[in-house]
């Protein structure tokens, strides 16, 4: 599995600010979107382009235009919505597929409760967005749903990832690509990432 830890100074700086315990909801939300945008820049670096001719200010001009598979952004509810706008800043024409998944706090297993995928998802590249890759359960279950629907080109974008989640994802879906702003130390006894970001969903939606 391709694993990319984005080490750009801007990414590291913004993620560091997100780790502050007393960060405001507004600031956390802004930074989640900004880091999501920077991760998208990395994840789409291999998109193919083609030459097309358009009418410029002084006559015809040849430009590069993205070709090939179109994109669907797949936020995992609810926290994934915090990264979605940042992704769409780079790929504004992308369609949105939504997957609702929550983690059973006792078993740590993912529980699906909603899904709405674009109709032609088999023709698109999916960018799954979720702030945390902890045990990997929610992301793995989401990929299962996408593959069942016919999607074969899948990339995962997360703010922070635990080694345990990376290992589980690689075992379940070695053909996907993972882009993260940080590979953190690991999980605590409650299944939360250390040092992590705390509860990203609560911080994005102001419910902490």
Curated annotation (Swiss-Prot):
Its EC number is 2.4.2.9. Pathway: Pyrimidine metabolism; UMP biosynthesis via salvage pathway; UMP from uracil: step 1/1. Its cofactor is Mg(2+). Keywords: Allosteric enzyme, Glycosyltransferase, GTP-binding, Magnesium, Nucleotide-binding, Transferase. GO terms for molecular function: GTP binding; magnesium ion binding; uracil phosphoribosyltransferase activity. It holds the Pfam family UPRTase. The keyword Magnesium applies. Catalyzes the conversion of uracil and 5-phospho-alpha-D-ribose 1-diphosphate (PRPP) to UMP and diphosphate. This is Uracil phosphoribosyltransferase. It comes from Salmonella typhimurium (strain LT2 / SGSC1412 / ATCC 700720).
């Amino acid at each position: 599995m391709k694993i990319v830890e984005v080490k750009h100074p801007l990414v590291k700086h913004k993620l560091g600010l997100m780790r502050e315990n007393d960060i405001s909801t507004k600031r956390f939300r802004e930074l989640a979107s900004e880091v999501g945008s920077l991760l998208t820049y990395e994840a789409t670096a291999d998109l193919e382009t083609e030459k097309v001719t358009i009418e410029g200010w002084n006559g015809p001009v040849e430009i590069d235009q993205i070709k090939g598979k179109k994109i669907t952004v797949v936020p995992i509810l609810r926290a994934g919505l915090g990264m979605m706008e940042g992704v769409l800043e780079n790929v504004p024409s992308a369609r949105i597929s939504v997957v609702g998944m929550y983690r059973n706090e006792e078993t740590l297993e993912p529980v699906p409760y909603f899904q709405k995928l674009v109709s032609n998802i088999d023709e698109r590249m999916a960018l799954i967005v979720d702030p945390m890759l902890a045990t990997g359960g929610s992301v793995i279950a989401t990929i299962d749903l996408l593959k069942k629907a016919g999607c074969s080109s899948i990339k995962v974008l997360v703010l922070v990832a635990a080694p345990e989640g990376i290992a589980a994802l690689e075992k379940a879906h070695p053909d996907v690509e993972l882009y993260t702003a940080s590979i953190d130390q690991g999980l605590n006894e409650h299944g939360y990432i250390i040092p992590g970001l705390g509860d990203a969903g609560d911080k994005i939606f102001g419910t902490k």
